[in-house]
Protein backbone atom coordinates (compact mmCIF):
# COMPACT_ATOMS: atom_id res chain seq x y z
CA UNK A 1 0.00 0.00 0.00
CA UNK A 2 1.24 3.47 -0.92
CA UNK A 3 1.83 5.83 1.99
CA UNK A 4 -0.10 9.10 2.04
CA UNK A 5 2.88 11.35 2.80
CA UNK A 6 5.16 11.70 -0.22
CA UNK A 7 7.42 14.65 0.72
CA UNK A 8 8.17 17.31 -1.88
CA UNK A 9 9.93 20.55 -0.90
CA UNK A 10 8.51 22.49 -3.85
CA UNK A 11 4.89 21.47 -3.23
CA UNK A 12 5.33 22.20 0.47
CA UNK A 13 6.58 25.72 -0.21
CA UNK A 14 3.95 26.44 -2.85
CA UNK A 15 1.03 25.50 -0.62
CA UNK A 16 2.29 26.60 2.80
CA UNK A 17 5.09 29.04 1.96
CA UNK A 18 5.32 32.74 2.75
CA UNK A 19 4.31 33.93 -0.71
CA UNK A 20 1.34 31.57 -0.73
CA UNK A 21 0.20 33.02 2.61
CA UNK A 22 0.64 36.61 1.41
CA UNK A 23 -1.40 35.91 -1.72
CA UNK A 24 -4.74 35.73 0.11
CA UNK A 25 -6.42 37.82 2.77
CA UNK A 26 -6.86 34.82 5.08
CA UNK A 27 -3.24 33.83 4.54
CA UNK A 28 -2.18 37.27 5.77
CA UNK A 29 -4.38 36.74 8.82
CA UNK A 30 -2.55 33.48 9.50
CA UNK A 31 0.79 35.32 9.38
CA UNK A 32 -0.40 38.12 11.66
CA UNK A 33 -1.73 35.59 14.20
CA UNK A 34 1.59 33.75 14.16
CA UNK A 35 3.47 37.04 14.60
CA UNK A 36 1.21 37.99 17.52
CA UNK A 37 1.76 34.60 19.13
CA UNK A 38 5.52 35.09 18.76
CA UNK A 39 6.25 32.13 16.52
CA UNK A 40 9.92 31.76 15.62
CA UNK A 41 8.96 30.49 12.14
CA UNK A 42 5.99 32.08 10.40
CA UNK A 43 5.91 29.65 7.49
CA UNK A 44 7.61 26.42 6.43
UniProtKB/Swiss-Prot annotation:
Residues 24-44 are annotated as: Disordered. Transmembrane segments: none annotated. Residues 31-44 have a biased composition (Basic residues). One of its GO terms (biological process) is translation. GO terms for cellular component: ribonucleoprotein complex; ribosome. Keywords: Ribonucleoprotein, Ribosomal protein. One of its GO terms (molecular function) is structural constituent of ribosome. Pfam families: Ribosomal_L34. Belongs to the bacterial ribosomal protein bL34 family. PANTHER family: LARGE RIBOSOMAL SUBUNIT PROTEIN BL34M, MITOCHONDRIAL RIBOSOMAL PROTEIN 34 FAMILY MEMBER. NCBIfam families: rpmH_bact. This is Large ribosomal subunit protein bL34. It comes from Stutzerimonas stutzeri (strain A1501).
Amino acid sequence: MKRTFQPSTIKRARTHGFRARMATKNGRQVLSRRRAKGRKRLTV
